[in-house]
Amino acid sequence: MLTKVQKRDGRQVDFDASKIKNAILKAFKSVDGEITPYAEQKAENIADYIEGYYEDEATATIEEIQDLVEKGLMSTRRKDVARAYITYRNQRTEEREKNTEIFKIVKEKLSASNVQNQNANVDEHSFGGRKGEASNEVNKYIALTEYMSPRARDNHINNRIYTHDLDSYVVGMHNCLSVPFDILLSDGFNTRQTDIRPASSINTAFQLVAVIFQLQSLQQFGGVSATHLDWTMVPYVRKSFVKHFCDAMEWVYDDCMDIRPQMEFYINSSIDLEKTDCPFYKENKKAYNYALKMTIKELNQAVEGMYHNLNTLQSRSGNQLPFTSINYGTCTLLEGRLVIKALLEGSIKGVGKLHRTPIFPCGIFQCMKGVNRKPGDPNYDLFQLALKSTSLRLYPNYANVDWSGNAGYDIHDPRTYFSTMGCRTANGFDINAEPGTNPQIKDGRGNICPVTIILPTLAMEANGDVDKFMEILDKAIADARDQLIERFDWICAQDPKSAQFMYENGTMLGYKPEEGIRSALKHGTLAIGQLGLAETLQILIGKDQTSPEGMELAKKIEQLFKDRCAEYKQKYKLNFGVYYTPAENLCYTAMKKFKDKYGIIPNVSDRDFFTNSIHVPVYKEISPFDKIDIESQLTGYSSAGCITYVELDGGVKNNIAALETLVNYAMDKDIPYFAINIPNDTCLDCGFTGEFNDHCPVCGSDNIQQLRRVTGYLTGNYKTAFNKGKQQEVEMRVKHGKGNI
């Protein structure tokens, strides 16, 4: 007689026949919709049969008992009930196996026994990293099994359409945001514990920039940016100047309070210090010179403080620094020029005792015709300083304010100038712009959520047939649309208290409490990204976009993306956009899945990574000008973000003119966002910076940091921070400048 049952975890419990009966009755009810006397009788008979099946006082496992239940049901005339029981049993087995697998993954993350460097900005060995990554795996599992539609889940699992940041899906977070610093610094803001007064000096303003970046980064999973920091900081440079001027005047007069109110007009004036006709400044030249000197000193210290804060204040799990970006370069007022100069000199100076290259913020110099690109332009000297910074620190990157894709911007409103959120994400024309506002305003808008279509998978499904591929791609783009709307609706369903800082302070444009958070989120973008165009072309025609035939097909593919996004934008009144995905981790994981299914295919899967979006493969021997020529034919199809970069060797640090030629060439070719990769190796013992391999040429140390660009951002030592695929990609990057500049 059966007396004990051994559970799956090894525990033994008393045999309970009622549990067998209940399981059998559930199977009958699932088929018949009710429990009949026949069902009750069969459940009783099978339970008695199992109890008496064993001799003496026996112990049976769960699996053995379930096998006997199946045998008993199959012996009846109700084979349909037997099938229902078997199906349910198999489903439960699959769920247990999934739970076992997720438990295994969580244990690996908690112990850091299988570090994969999915995010180069997260230290997976740290306490916070281990805890955060374990939590992320659980969140991803719940998103896939409980929240995503079956179609979206299948596309993700089958390496067709990747849903980004699954760990943030369930809680309904959005991706990234361009923060409206003009408003937050001038009006102050509230936090959960207190409220913050408006900035009263340039030092305070830069401190608050770091604070706001930190606070906003906790409301989302992506990057945060300032769209025109040079313009934003002008009033606070002036506030500091007025303070220092009055301090100087107090050394001359007993009381300066009578003149202070008369100077306040200058703070919000459109006329800068050099042109103001304020009589107090002209009549007190020594005080003026003192105030200007002290203001510049305060400004430099404030910028230095911001750089250090943004590289040390780790506010996310995993000891993660917020992904911060600052756009600047177009303000021609003296005060704005001082800000630009301080930002660039701070970048060149570096951070810490070894003056290391700042990882954050990502600096983005906004190139603008008539402002900073040519000799004689008012900010041309600052463009030269930006190039020097790029040669030494890789930052800044370069945004093209005159890009054709940003048509309609207001030359008098820097909020409408083209800017990016660092890696490449950008805000295009807002179809939901409020009446009377410019649809190109970037502040308070961001990318809500992205997906990425794995193009090589679709090419394999088409068996190399171009027409069939285009049909499959068209359906995949429609699927991507549906997945984005599905996630957008879920994000819009969240309580504003979930991101109280963002909604209470209006950091996201257009929030109206009576209409819910959709009123703000509708101004952001829904990005349809892509991965592996070069490999896709190889599958379809045996050539990539560096050939005329490859470029012709590439344009056809990108036109389909653009046309569909434009169509969806009008139909759904949501800002769908074509996105050239960074694919920091996806370039490797998508390739790994591809290889598992299709094996090694020459020029397609014979490496550990897919080529990002529409880029020329990194291993192609090509000049920087040719690379720009090729990619410039495709970047115009993207409205939600793209980047073009070239790879140069360390010798360019002594050839600023060559960098200027390249940047201007890219801008003239209508490249929206351009970056230059230059090796940046630092000895962490003596501080020497240059290009070297395993040992410092000065002190011989092997304590080396080899800094490389991972997407649009920089990160730490690529040999430890990047995943396997991205490491290989970095090592295969050819120098485009050899003999070409």
Give the ranges of each region predicted by the language model.
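Charged, amphipathic alpha-helical regulatory modules used
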Residues: 1-109, 728, 732-733
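A ubiquitous short alpha-helical element
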Residues: 7-12, 30-37, 55, 433, ...
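Short, mixed-charge aromatic SLiMs
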Residues: 46-52, 73, 553-567, 729-740
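Long, highly charged low-complexity segments enriched in Glu/Asp and Lys/Arg with interspersed Ser/Thr
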Residues: 79-92, 670-672, 677-679, 720-741
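Conserved catalytic cores of very large enzyme subunits
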Residues: 91-95, 102-522, 539, 543, ...
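Extended amphipathic alpha-helical segments enriched in small hydrophobics
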Residues: 528-537
